[in-house]
Amino acid sequence: MNSREIRQSFLDFFAGKEHRIVRSAPVIPAEDPTLLFTNAGMNQFKDVFLGKGTREYTRAADTQKCIRASGKHNDLEDVGRDTYHHTFFEMLGNWSFGDYYKKEAIGWAWELMTEVWKLPKERLYATVYHDDEESFKLWQSETDIEHSHILKFGDKDNFWEMGETGPCGPCSEIHIDLTPDGSGGPLVNVGDHRVIELWNLVFIQYDRQADGTLVPLPQKHVDTGMGFERVAAVLQGKSSNYDSDVFAPLFDRITELTGTVYTASLDSPSDIAMRVIADHCRTLTFALSDGAMPGNEGRGYVLRRILRRAVRYAGTLGCHEPIIYKMVEVLVRTMGDVFPELEKQQATVEKIIRAEEESFLVTLGRGTEIFNEVVADMKTAGSTTISGADAFKLYDTFGFPLDLTRLMAAEVGLGIDEAGFEHCMMEQKTRARMDRKGKMQMQDDGGEWQWFAPEAPTTFVGYDMLETEATLVAARVSGDKLLMVLDQTPFYAESGGQVGDHGTLETAGYRLDVTDTRKDGEQIVHVVTSAHDKVRDCAVTPADVSFDGVVSVKAAVDRDRRVATERNHTATHLLHAALRKVLGEHVQQKGSLVTPERLRFDFSHFSKVSAEELEQVEHEVNAEIRKAASVTKHADVPYEEALALGALAFFGDKYADRVRVVEVPGISIELCGGTHVGNIGQIGMVKIVSESSVAAGIRRIEAVTGAAAEALLWQEYRDLQEIKNLLKLKADEEAGPKIKELLEEKKALDKQLQESRLAGLLDRLAASLAGGEEVNGCRIMTERLDGVSGDELRQAAVALRERVPCAVGLLCGVADGKVSLVAFASDEAVKSLKLDAGKLVKEAAASVKGGGGGKLELATAGGKEPAGIDKAIEVFVASVKSALQ
């Protein structure tokens, strides 16, 4: 049977047993943001097992897409080195929700294995939990398995638990003996690849309490799982999952792309590389098809690690250009009918993978050079361990995940100081945290809180009103500010990217200007920066404000600022929806800043957003604004209910049990605690100001709305009119063609000037061409040329190395206070005399307190110390002579 027939026969078998054949859940668990990836078939039924959900059916079966590349289920570093580890796999499974139980589950499993798939009964073993006498007896009575092949094991092997508490129960596993002589009974559950588990039947019958006791469940469930790749290999008579027809098309494609042929060897480096690439391509394709994106944290970073491992392994096959994206079509062709999302998302997935490959290949070469330098230093010093600092530099500067550096180190017989790496990582996180704290935390150099009422959470009433009467709860001076807490307030405290409200607080004696509002736990803190004494009718410093007894406060939010902020906040929701519509559903919000003046929106995307795409996004947003739909706010919605409504929720975001949902019907629905307009028509219009990169895979759009957008358009119109006037264009003439013509003229003139300057520079170097010391037939040329840019020195060096058959030289100069060094070596000097311009310039650069490097024939360096140039020349000449001896 081929793999397609095996998968279908499983589903057909259980359809014949009155099971609902359900679709695989996405590998990105949409309703469980705490889980990185779907890693088992039961994930989509977790709510049923927990008693929180139901289904319209009581029997189900499917083939579930799974990824295990993080947490306790992490097979990443084992992939490629054995016959069975994968980061992506399919899990065939059947379930009973309070319907059939052990008798049917065991009987049907045996029927499928032995009667449908014709596996040899004498090679099969069944394991049961040592206290599960019911299952033990059912194996004897409901199947014709050899009774000596029914084995008992303990908690580690045959008791399943969802967590420390909750649903659990005994399980029964079916193993197959693949030893040549069928003597593998003693190898069951010892981790020997010759006797492997095929199917796990879990019988969920208990609820584990916090004290460890087991309470019987009112309903008993069945949850089974069988690795599709493993059973395909067994049924096809293969000793490795990778030798089945599941992987054969991928290996064929790798051979087409690299010229390397797969030989099914466990030890061959090229075969290991091909297994890794095939596995990782599957993981990436399925994850991206389900909406994941490579990134710098969470599941995004797991995917980026996987992709970079694949790219590096492709390099070991001699391929140093993007190829992983070219394998996606193989999966679409071989699995697209089973998983239609592959074909639907093919173009997007290919673009994402290609962009990631191209990005990493830029740094991979330089990072590998640094790694090789570190290895050379380690071996010279007699060390066998790469320092944590060096490993962290490769991670932080060149994007090498630690597991990639660990792999490369192992290939040359070195280890890594992983504790040192973690120390460097923690230091960086601490610095970042302190930096954020320094930027965000209010000054804390004042006195203690003065309390006027019992401490309690502040009630926020600002969704419904902008003014209210309140009572002062506490106050404190902090530097030149006064911090005030009220029992209730209409002031929105900064959170979720939306800045805090401004406004006034008025008491019987003071009018206080609030210029920021922050959260402190469950309390809202109003930051007062100026005050007016109403009794004396004069300005006072916030520190001079004093209160006595019960203080009534009239709190009033600056209406214009709030309304402008609301326009921009609702606009971010519309922008998010438009980006997902135009660019694809892989787009996810990664951050935002909403102020009265403008909005900033960070989102996941694999490449620069083109001008045409930005125009389309802006058009989509403004078209919706013109429809003037009402904005609906759903308050205090249970989290699960919000997800059922279709609200967007992403991994890594923390949500309360009850949430607020902001909906623009038919356009956008998001979990959001911010303030919004009542009707999107109030936004007026949105104008995108800029699009830029924030980090790898993260883009940023800045935009303005309403009056600010109108003002921007008028300014752009005035600028255009001024340009047309300067160019003496008629009203109906376009400025673009004329500007392009002028730029082309300027480019030609710049080129003439550059050629003229280079010719003059070479004339100045004529003496060096004629002179210069010769050693072993190689002329050594050095010259200092102040006032000449590094780029001009480089052009001169290129010209010089082509004019002298065998020469090596160093050109130095100081321009704008910066030292530039350019070393060159002619082809003859490189090939015959083994001179290395990169090494020579690096040694010379130390004299000017700088560094650099480059290729064998041409290299550059910079420095901070002009006084060291003469010394740099001496070092260069000495290094050349030493190399030529």
Curated annotation (Swiss-Prot):
Documented EC number(s): 6.1.1.7
One GO molecular-function entry: zinc ion binding
PROSITE patterns: AA_TRNA_LIGASE_II_ALA
Cofactor(s), by name: Zn(2+)
Keyword Zinc-finger: no
Reaction(s) the record says it catalyses: tRNA(Ala) + L-alanine + ATP = L-alanyl-tRNA(Ala) + AMP + diphosphate
Gene Ontology CC, one term: cytoplasm
Residue positions binding Zn(2+): H569, H573, C672, H676
InterPro entries listed in its UniProt record: aa-tRNA-synth_II/BPL/LPL (IPR045864), Ala-tRNA-lgiase_IIc (IPR002318), Ala-tRNA-ligase_IIc_anticod-bd (IPR018162), Ala-tRNA-synth_IIc_core (IPR018165), Ala-tRNA-synth_IIc_N (IPR018164), Ala-tRNA_ligase (IPR050058), Ala_tRNA_ligase_euk/bac (IPR023033), DHHA1_dom (IPR003156)
Co-factor note (free text): Binds 1 zinc ion per subunit.
Localisation: Cytoplasm
Any Pfam family: tRNA_SAD
SUPFAM superfamilies: Class II aaRS and biotin synthetases, Putative anticodon-binding domain of alanyl-tRNA synthetase (AlaRS), ThrRS/AlaRS common domain, Translation proteins
GO term, biological process aspect, one: alanyl-tRNA aminoacylation
Signal peptide: none
Keyword entries, A-Z: Aminoacyl-tRNA synthetase, ATP-binding, Cytoplasm, Ligase, Metal-binding, Nucleotide-binding, Protein biosynthesis, RNA-binding, tRNA-binding, Zinc
Recorded domain comment: Consists of three domains; the N-terminal catalytic domain, the editing domain and the C-terminal C-Ala domain. The editing domain removes incorrectly charged amino acids, while the C-Ala domain, along with tRNA(Ala), serves as a bridge to cooperatively bring together the editing and aminoacylation centers thus stimulating deacylation of misacylated tRNAs.
Entry similarity comment: Belongs to the class-II aminoacyl-tRNA synthetase family.
Purpose of the protein: Catalyzes the attachment of alanine to tRNA(Ala) in a two-step reaction: alanine is first activated by ATP to form Ala-AMP and then transferred to the acceptor end of tRNA(Ala). Also edits incorrectly charged Ser-tRNA(Ala) and Gly-tRNA(Ala) via its editing domain.
Protein name stated in the entry: Alanine--tRNA ligase
